[in-house]
């Protein structure tokens, strides 16, 4: 069940949202699928090539890329559903997995980006005091906790399966009967899944800026590490502002103002667009790996040099 879903009662009125979704979703999802699969698939390959020299940063990035790749694999099914005019043909179990995979990816991405930024900040500012926190072992444990927490928190989405009416099987649609529970889930998700991580990122950003503006630090060594930490945090914040903030804001507004007897086409279409923006974060994360990864560029060059030999 998703807030961009369309209640069945809409089909009885002159609402244009269904046509919009049929035209918009398939092409955008397939574009995200192509670039996301290419970028994250190759990134995973690079990370696995360097597993013997892994760092905590690489561990977080590998988990982030894995989360993105798993989600991206569901996008062709979503594209097919909307291309058929919101008619699901892949069975009840696959339907339940669709919404579940979307929100598991969204919030694991948010938490991996946040923890990655915090760990990089701590490793830069307090490298020896926080060594146990920034170790590879601690990174794997923390990633495991994030996976379990997000997957367990999203488990309620597995309750909602496909529904058949007039020989049309719907999936990913908003159910008026479960609207109140969905509204409560949204408020909790916004607070814990978005606002808390975003505030954490903002604090890290302000602190690292403050450190960089302090007494002069040599260009090599500490200052270079500070800049890499700042790059990580800035890319994470850009992802939050472009991908996650619009969706959470419009999703909440859409739910708060939702009326089952009204089309609400303009707001509904805007929410549809922001959902694809949230999904597109999977395409942007490879830029984080390239510009802020631990020796990612060097390892990338090593792979290409082997290919040319």
From Swiss-Prot:
GO MF annotation list: cysteinyl leukotriene receptor activity
Cytoplasmic side: 48-56, 120-138, 209-229, 293-309
Database matches in InterPro entries: CLT2_recept, Cyst_leuk_rcpt, GPCR_Rhodpsn, GPCR_Rhodpsn_7TM
Tissue specificity field: Widely expressed at low levels, with highest expression in the spleen, thymus and adrenal gland, and lower in the kidney, brain and peripheral blood leukocytes.
Repressor keyword on record: no
Membrane topology qualifier: Multi-pass membrane protein
Disulphides: 95-171
Lineage top rank: taxon: Eukaryota
Location(s), subcellular: Cell membrane
Gene3D superfamilies reported in the protein's UniProt record: Rhodopsin 7-helix transmembrane proteins
UniProt entry keywords in alphabetical sequence: Cell membrane, Disulfide bond, G-protein coupled receptor, Glycoprotein, Membrane, Receptor, Transducer, Transmembrane, Transmembrane helix
A Pfam match: 7tm_1
Record topological domains on the Extracellular side: 1-26, 78-98, 160-187, 251-271
Main location: membrane
TM segment ranges: 27-47, 57-77, 99-119, 139-159, 188-208, 230-250, 272-292
Positions of glycan attachment: 14
Record's GO cellular component terms: membrane; plasma membrane
Keyword Glycoprotein among record annotations: yes
Job description of the protein: Receptor for cysteinyl leukotrienes. The response is mediated via a G-protein that activates a phosphatidylinositol-calcium second messenger system. The rank order of affinities for the leukotrienes is LTC4 = LTD4 >> LTE4.
Assigned protein family: Belongs to the G-protein coupled receptor 1 family.
Protein name (database record): Cysteinyl leukotriene receptor 2
Gene (UniProt): Cysltr2
